[in-house]
């Protein structure tokens, strides 16, 4: 992105017929406007300084020009505090505007394919359904699939989401104005107005504070999560259902029945207490109330809008008797409109929705109006009324009016209910142990300490208490603050289910679950709150979900579930949950524990073993993938990731976390949001119905080889991170981890405990820190050594390499693993990483650790190219390669500035401007990388 029309970092291939021509033009336009803004508001000198830095950075990046690197260092090291802030903001906004142009171009290219009548692309529901129909899957099988499926991205609040709402709003405005130029035949005068609006938006953006002035509260995080319903979910999810039904109808050559609602958005925001003391019972209630308020407000608006269009007159049409009955109960219309039954019906629905919002305690517009209507008992009654309208229209030759907005509203009501999204509860197993220990102490005469009992003894006591009708809690005041807090949470959970329905709060996740005892402890706590009962009629209104996170726990999780299903009482309990058990697998902590290769491999093996155990016990399995935005935390393209799962492990059931800045990048723009949701649906359909990974059954030696690779990779990773003397110091000094803790980007502390031990550090800031210094260890370290050892020990190096190449060609798991590593390596930069290493005060430690990192990086590159046959990174993904090539020259100066600022700050310059500049660079680099945490 150039600040003026003379400079141009983009390759010269730039004719109007070239497919990326519009992208280049958008980038130039936005860059020129940002440059003009800097010139107008900061002066010509500042403009020239920023442009000099930009051109020098481009020269260094493009030509590996050492003189340019030295020149860049000299400029950046001599900036004043004021100049530093301006330069950081300039390059941060370069990255942001490039992202906007790039997202728009993705949409542009997809629309071009559609207009040209090109075949549907991988990841589209159109192609997925074509493939399953071609295989011979009939309409009834597809209907059964949708009826039993659940696909659920779950929004979580984590300290890597650095965008403010104000910034997101202006991103959308700029994108809308660019779309206007793209799709509309503007007159010269309209084009001038469009450019002025763009300039105004960019100027406002430049003068808008990027950083939050105070740390986010959980309430703030709840509101931030809700904006994506307005941006994308409320309208795009019904659109996807309509698209699926229309495709099925075309394939069946007849009207397809309505498919079941299987795609739903979940949330942890306001229910995730693990390590966050600010999530209380009041906060959880607030989250449920805000969810309900938003969706009821949406329904009221849509009913108003649709009702205004339903001007059909009884003098010209007929209606069903059901609709007549519904219209007769509605408030009156003016005499001039008394012959309009559909309007009367929508007026009645509108009144009942307002009464419902008042009944549920939602504070939304219209609730203070005089209204004697009866509230809906639940969302099913609302859906029933909409169905009466739809049937009447279809029965009386008005089918088209039953489509569009009315069809979408009916689907929204079925998907979102009156609760909007299922809110998950989550807490650490150690907290449950503490609470149960207190309950045990207060209710038994046993001298033993609960925590000192063996696990089998605990299980025996827990099962006995679960069968016993008595309550262990008489008064909250008898217990510690921690126990009181947990008991109040569960009491509030029962109240939320009573008010908003069981679907509002259906899941309880146990962090760091390691055994059956942890599951039964939660069962007992749910029993105390009236959410679960054992005995003659066992049932539960909550799914108990163990989260297995460490390498050891992943290896043992199938045995844990086998033991759990061997308990007759628990098996009976599952019948009340549709005989389905959910298990969550943690990518982040397992990566921090054992490294990239081993984390992925152990999760893959765990899925295989879990599938076998569940099949043997006749229990349905749903896997919940706890992953982040980065490859180091399980991120990467969703389509390939789901297709790479072991056979039988998906079976139409998948939940996965959407975290940090990934939520904004995926779901701010509605077209991109719809595409991402479609991708999840398409991959789940194909993975379930096509059984693409049959290689698992035919090549067991692949697993033997992966076991060897994983063992070597884990040893190399742990040797570096946990066994290298002084590595903790290297990490703390060569990354901005301590400065991240001061950035107001999340409500949770960066560590679970008040400690700077790597074991206690949350996986999110761990990965975020390595991303910011461009080392990105969690996404590749250990792979190079693993392959090197395997090839050398094989005896015949060429034969060993051929085996790995065959595995790569035929096994989706290894393809996805190496593709994700390829992406990480393309964003890493050891030249910049070495500059961060210079911040380490011990020269011997710096030399020792960074030499190990560089050696492993070179081995990774060597063997990645050898196995894939590529000669450069991202050779098979030119779109991503182009994206990184465009953005990197704007990220590099931010990294160089961050290094200099960290050096100043750690040397005692604690000027507020320096702190703010450091935080701005953290924000800017995260924006440029796009999946940093």
From Swiss-Prot:
Record HAMAP family: PEPcase_type1
A GO BP entry = tricarboxylic acid cycle
The organism's superkingdom is given as: Bacteria
Cofactor(s) listed in the protein's UniProt record: Mg(2+)
Question: In the UniProt entry, which residues are flagged as the active site?
Answer: 158, 592
Name the Gene Ontology molecular function terms of this record: magnesium ion binding; phosphoenolpyruvate carboxylase activity
List the record's Gene Ontology CC terms alphabetically: cytosol
Q: Which family does it belong to?
A: Belongs to the PEPCase type 1 family.
Q: What is its EC number?
A: 4.1.1.31
Protein name, entry field: Phosphoenolpyruvate carboxylase
Top enzyme class: lyase
The catalytic activity, as recorded, is: oxaloacetate + phosphate = phosphoenolpyruvate + hydrogencarbonate
Report keywords, A-Z.
Carbon dioxide fixation, Lyase, Magnesium
InterPro entries assigned to the protein according to its UniProt record, in alphabetical order: PEP_COase, PEP_COase_bac/pln-type, PEP_COase_Lys_AS, PEPCASE_His_AS, Pyrv/PenolPyrv_kinase-like_dom
Query: According to its UniProt entry, what is the function of this protein?
Result: Forms oxaloacetate, a four-carbon dicarboxylic acid source for the tricarboxylic acid cycle.
């Amino acid at each position: 992105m150039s600040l003026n029309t003379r400079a141009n970092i983009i390759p010269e291939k730039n004719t109007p017929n070239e497919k990326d021509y519009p992208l280049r033009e958008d980038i130039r336009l936005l860059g020129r406007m940002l440059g003009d803004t800097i010139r107008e508001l900061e002066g010509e000198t500042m403009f020239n300084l920023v442009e000099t830095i930009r051109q020098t950075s481009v020269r260094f990046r493009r030509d590996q020009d050492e003189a340019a690197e030295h020149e860049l260092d000299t400029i950046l090291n001599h900036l004043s505090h004021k100049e530093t802030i301006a330069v950081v903001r300039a390059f941060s906004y370069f990255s942001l505007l490039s992202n906007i142009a790039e997202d728009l171009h993705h949409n542009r290219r997809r629309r071009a394919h559609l207009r040209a009548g090109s075949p549907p692309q991988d990841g589209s529901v159109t192609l997925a359904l074509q493939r399953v129909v071609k295989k011979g899957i009939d309409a009834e099988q597809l209907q059964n699939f949708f009826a039993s499926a659940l696909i659920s991205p779950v929004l979580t609040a984590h300290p890597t989401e650095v965008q403010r709402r104000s910034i997101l709003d202006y991103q959308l405005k700029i994108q809308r104005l660019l779309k206007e130029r793209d799709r509309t035949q503007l007159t010269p005068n309209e084009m001038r107005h469009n450019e002025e609006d763009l300039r105004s938006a960019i100027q406002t953006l430049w003068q808008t504070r990027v950083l939050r002035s105070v740390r986010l509260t959980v309430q703030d995080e709840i509101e931030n999560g809700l904006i994506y319903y307005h941006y994308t979910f409320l309208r795009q999810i019904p659109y996807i259902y309509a698209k699926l039904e229309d495709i099925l109808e075309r394939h069946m050559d007849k009207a397809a029945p309505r498919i079941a609602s299987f795609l739903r958005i979940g949330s942890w925001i306001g229910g995730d207490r693990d390590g966050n003391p600010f999530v209380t019972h009041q906060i959880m209630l607030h989250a449920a109330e805000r969810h309900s308020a938003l969706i009821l407000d949406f329904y009221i608006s849509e009913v108003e809008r649709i009702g205004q269009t339903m001007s059909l007159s009884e003098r010209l049409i007929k209606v069903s008797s059901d609709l007549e009955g519904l219209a007769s109960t509605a408030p009156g219309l003016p005499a001039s409109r008394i012959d309009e039954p559909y309007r009367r019906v929508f007026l009645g629905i509108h009144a009942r929705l307002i009464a419902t919002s008042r009944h549920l305690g939602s504070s939304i517009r219209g609730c203070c109006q005089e209204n004697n209507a009866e509230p809906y008992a639940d969302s099913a009654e609302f859906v029933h009324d909409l169905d009466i309208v739809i049937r009447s229209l279809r029965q009386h030759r008005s089918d088209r009016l039953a489509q569009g907005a009315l069809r979408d509203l009916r689907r929204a009501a079925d998907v979102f209910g009156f609760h909007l999204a299922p809110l998950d509860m989550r807490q650490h197993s150690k907290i449950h142990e503490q609470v149960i220990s207190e309950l045990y102490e207060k209710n038994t005469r046993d001298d033993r300490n609960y925590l000192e009992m063996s696990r089998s003894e605990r299980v025996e006591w827990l099962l006995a208490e679960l069968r016993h009708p008595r309550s262990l809690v008489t008064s909250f005041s008898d217990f510690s603050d921690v126990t009181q807090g947990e008991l109040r949470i569960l009491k509030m959970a029962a109240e939320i289910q009573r008010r908003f329905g069981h679907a509002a709060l259906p899941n309880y996740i146990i962090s760091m679950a390691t055994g059956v005892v942890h599951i039964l402890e939660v069962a007992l706590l749910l029993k105390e709150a009236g959410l679960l009962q054992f005995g003659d009629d066992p049932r539960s209104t909550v799914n108990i979900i163990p989260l297995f996170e460490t390498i050891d726990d992943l290896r043992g999780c199938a045995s844990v579930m086998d033991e759990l299903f061997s308990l007759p009482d628990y098996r009976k309990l599952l019948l009340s949950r549709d005989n389905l058990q959910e298990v969550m697998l943690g990518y982040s902590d397992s990566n921090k524990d054992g490294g990239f290769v081993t984390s992925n491999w152990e999760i893959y093996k765990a899925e295989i073993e879990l599938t076998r155990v569940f099949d043997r016990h006749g229990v349905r399995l749903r896997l919940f993938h706890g992953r982040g935005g980065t490859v180091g935390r399980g991120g990467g393209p969703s389509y390939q990731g789901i297709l790479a799962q072991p056979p039988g492990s998906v079976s139409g059931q998948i939940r996965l976390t959407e975290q940090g800045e990934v939520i904004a990048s995926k779901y701010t723009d509605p077209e991109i949001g719809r595409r991402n949701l479609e991708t999840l649906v398409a991959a789940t359909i194909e993975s379930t119905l096509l059984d693409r990974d049959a290689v698992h059954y035919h090549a067991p030696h692949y697993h033997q080889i992966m076991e060897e690779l994983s063992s070597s990779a884990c040893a190399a990773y742990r040797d570096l991170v946990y066994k290298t003397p002084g590595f903790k110091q290297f990490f703390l000094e060569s990354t901005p981890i301590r400065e991240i803790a001061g950035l107001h980007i999340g409500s949770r502390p960066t560590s679970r405990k008040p400690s700077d031990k790597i074991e206690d550090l949350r996986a999110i800031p761990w990965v975020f820190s390595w991303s910011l210094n461009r080392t990105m260890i969690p996404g590749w370290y250990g792979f190079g050594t693993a392959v090197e050892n395997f090839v050398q020990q094989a005896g015949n190096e060429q034969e060993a390499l051929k085996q790995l190449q065959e595995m790569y060609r035929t096994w989706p798991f290894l393809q996805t693993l190496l593709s994700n590593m390829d992406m990480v390596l393309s964003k890493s930069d050891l030249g910049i990483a070495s500059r961060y290493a210079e911040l380490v005060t011990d020269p011997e430690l710096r030399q020792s650790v960074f030499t190990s990192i560089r050696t492993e990086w070179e081995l990774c590159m060597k063997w990645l190219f050898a196995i894939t046959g590529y000669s450069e990174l991202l050779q098979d993904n030119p779109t991503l390669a182009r994206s990184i090539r465009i953005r990197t020259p704007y990220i590099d100066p931010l990294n160089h500035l961050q290094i200099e600022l960290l050096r100043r700050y750690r040397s005692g310059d604690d000027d507020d401007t320096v702190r703010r500049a450091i935080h701005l660079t953290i924000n800017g680099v995260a924006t440029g990388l796009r999946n940093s945490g």
